[in-house]
Regions:
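AAA+ P-loop NTPase nucleotide-binding core of proteostasis motors
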Residues: 1-29, 33-42, 46-55, 59-286
Length: 286
C-alpha cells in the first residue's frame, strides 16, 4: 500500500524512506513535486518520475518495477482555492495526472541516455512500485482542530471564518512568530496530537483531491523532534555532526568539546526556529 508521510520539516521523513530503500536493496528515486506540471506545459511531466527510478536501477526494468518512489513536497500540489482546476497545471492537474501511475499502469519512457536500450522506448509497470508521498502540510493541524470543534448555524452552515488551506496556512505562519518560549513545547504537543487525528476529509479540505487521497491508504504522522532527540541526533549517529566538527578541528590540532548544556542550547535554538534536525548544521556553523 502507498504511504503518506506528513509532519514538520526536519523530522526525518526523507531519511526514513531512504533507509527503507537501503534495507530492502531496491532502486530509489526522489521526486520534487513542486517541479511537476501537467503534460504539455513547461516543467517535468509525470513520466519523469519513473524515468528517475529506472535510471537508479541502471535501466533494469524488472528491478525498477520493485522500487520505491518518494514524492517530496506533495502538499505543494494541493489545489488552491480560487484557481480554476483547468488552469491549475502545477496543482490539481498534477494530482490528476498521477492517479493511474499510483494505482498501477504501464508507463512508456522515451529512452535518452542508456546505451543498452539503443533508443527504444521502455515500458515500466508501476503496479508493484511503492509510492511514498511526503509533505509538511502547514496548517493541516488547524483544519483538524476546526473539524473537531466546528459549530453549525441554521441548516448546517459552518460558522468557521477560515476557508481551507490558504487561511489555515496563514494562521499557522502567524503562530510561528507569536509562540512564546514558555509555551513552545505545549504548542508542539498540541500540533502532534492534532496530526494523529488526521482524516481523509482534512486532506481534501487542505487541497488534495479525493481520488489522490484514496490512493494513499496508509497515513503516517511525524511529530516534532524534542530537545533530547535533537541532542541524540547531534552526537549518536555514525555521521553525527559533533564528531564531524571535532574531526575538522583536529586537523588543526584543536580539541573541540561540547558541554551538555551547550548541546541542549543548540537543540533549543533549532526548536525555536522550527527547522528540526535540518537546521542543526546551520546553527553549528554560525
Amino acid at each position: 500500500s502507498n504511504i503518506l508521510l506528513l509532519g514538520p520539516t526536519g523530522s526525518g521523513k526523507t531519511l526514513l524512506a531512504q533507509t527503507v530503500a537501503i534495507c530492502l536493496d531496491v532502486p530509489f528515486a526522489i521526486c520534487d513535486c513542486t517541479t511537476l506540471t501537467q503534460a504539455g506545459y513547461v516543467g517535468e511531466d509525470i513520466e519523469s518520475i519513473i524515468a528517475k527510478l529506472l535510471q537508479d536501477a541502471n535501466y533494469n526494468v524488472e528491478k525498477a518495477q520493485q522500487g520505491i518512489v518518494f514524492l517530496d513536497e506533495v502538499d505543494k500540489i494541493g489545489a488552491v482555492p480560487g484557481i480554476h482546476q483547468l488552469r491549475d497545471v502545477g496543482g490539481e492537474g498534477v494530482q490528476q495526472g498521477m492517479l493511474k501511475m499510483l494505482e498501477g499502469t504501464l508507463v512508456t519512457i522515451p529512452e535518452r541516455n542508456s546505451r543498452k536500450m539503443r533508443g527504444e522506448p521502455i515500458v515500466v509497470d508501476t503496479t508493484n512500485i511503492l509510492f511514498i508521498a511526503s509533505g509538511a502540510f502547514n496548517g493541516l493541524d488547524r483544519i483538524v482542530n476546526r473539524r473537531k470543534n466546528e459549530k453549525y448555524l441554521g441548516f448546517g452552515a459552518q460558522s468557521s471564518e477560515s476557508q481551507g488551506r490558504r487561511a489555515a496556512t496563514a494562521a499557522d505562519v502567524a503562530d510561528n512568530y507569536s509562540t512564546a518560549d514558555s509555551s513552545l513545547l505545549e504548542d508542539m504537543i498540541e500540533k502532534d496530537q492534532l496530526l494523529n487525528a488526521v482524516e481523509s476529509r482534512d486532506l481534501i479540505e487542505f487541497g488534495m483531491i479525493p481520488e489522490f487521497v484514496g490512493r494513499f491508504p496508509v497515513v503516517v504522522p511525524f511529530h516534532n523532534l524534542t530537545e533530547n532527540m535533537l541532542v541524540q541526533i547531534l552526537t549518536e549517529p555514525q555521521n553525527a555532526l559533533i564528531p564531524q566538527f571535532q574531526k575538522l578541528f583536529s586537523m588543526d590540532n584543536v580539541e573541540l568539546t561540547f558541554e551538555p548544556k551547550a548541546l541542549r542550547r543548540i537543540a533549543k535554538v533549532a526548536m525555536e526556529r522550527k527547522t528540526g534536525a535540518r537546521g542543526l548544521r546551520a546553527i553549528l556553523v554560525n
